[in-house]
A protein has these predicted regions:
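Conserved NAD(P)H cofactor-binding loop of Rossmann-fold oxidoreductase domains
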Residues: 99-104
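C-terminal helical subdomain
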Residues: 189-190, 209-250
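Conserved glycine-rich cofactor-binding loop
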Residues: 35-36
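Residue(s) in the substrate-gating loop at a strand-loop-helix junction
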Residues: 150
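Active-site helix of classical SDR
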Residues: 131, 166
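Alpha-helical segment proximal to the catalytic Tyr-Lys
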Residues: 136, 178-180
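Substrate-binding pocket helix/loop in short-chain dehydrogenase/reductase
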Residues: 107-108, 115-117
Length: 251
């Protein structure tokens, strides 16, 4: 009598993942620009992940129960002071997400110099000021910084000299920070494409996305921030490009 062995053809095996470290808990996350746009989506994502968001913005967030301080992020001293006040209010951060941003469109010679420089102060200097003030707490917690660049961190665009300069600066700052704090603080650069937010409101029509523009849902972008924050200690996502599949500004 002969016996046959069942064929294993077509069967799949389950990988043993028991040795993998568990995702990190999302703790207290300071979010600049958390009152609107991507920042507000990050606040919601942090709450959904069981974390505690705290907002630094020029306006209060619409979501009730979220700690916040109104601050001009273009004022570096005020931004640093706001971080210290948030520590007293909600405790030290385990992560910082710098989602605040502004813009001034137009030819360089036609933009008011103060408006041009404000873009750099908010987007770059505001990012640096908040991160600098939070670093001692982040290092103690082995926390994470997520800065927000742009596809204009990767290439310049006509009539966007201020925004391009500020976002190239954020990218360079983030790369250098990652090298400086390697092994002590996680550092991630998020490069989002265009999103369906109020960021484009107030622009003249020539500087608004066209009717056929493929803009991403900010909630999708915010979800990737949570992925970065949940990386186990010793693992980091150094750079993320997140955009709608029809994004035209990159590559």
């Amino acid at each position: 009598m002969t016996t046959s062995t069942p064929s294993t053809t077509g069967m799949t095996s389950t990988a043993d993942l028991s040795g993998l470290p568990a995702p990190r808990t999302v703790g207290t996350v300071y979010v600049t620009g958390g009152a609107s746009g991507l920042g507000a989506a990050v606040v919601d994502a942090v709450l959904a992940a069981g974390g505690t968001p705290a907002v630094l913005d020029r306006a209060a967030p619409q979501r009730e129960g979220v700690a916040s301080l109104e601050v001009d992020l273009g004022d570096s001293a005020a931004a640093a002071e706001a971080v210290a006040r948030l520590v007293e209010q909600v405790g030290p951060p385990t992560a910082v997400v710098t989602a605040a941003g502004t813009d001034a469109c137009g030819p360089l010679t036609e933009i008011d110099p103060e408006a041009w420089e404000k873009v750099v102060r908010v987007n770059l200097f505001g990012t640096v000021a908040v991160v600098r003030a939070a670093l001692p707490y982040l290092e103690e917690a082995r926390g994470t910084v997520v800065t927000v660049g742009s596809t204009l961190s990767l290439r310049g665009m006509s009539d966007a000299t201020a925004y391009s300069a500020s976002k190239f600066g954020v990218r360079g700052f983030t790369h250098a920070l990652a090298a400086e704090y390697a092994g002590r603080v996680g550092v991630t650069l998020l490069i989002p494409g265009g999103m369906r937010t109020a960021f484009f409101d107030g622009r003249t029509e020539q500087y608004k996305p066209g009717p056929d523009a493929d803009l991403n849902d900010p909630r999708h972008t915010a979800a990737t921030v949570i992925t970065a924050l949940q990386q186990p200690v010793g693992s980091e996502i150094r750079e993320m490009l997140v955009m709608a599949s029809g994004e035209s500004s990159w590559p």
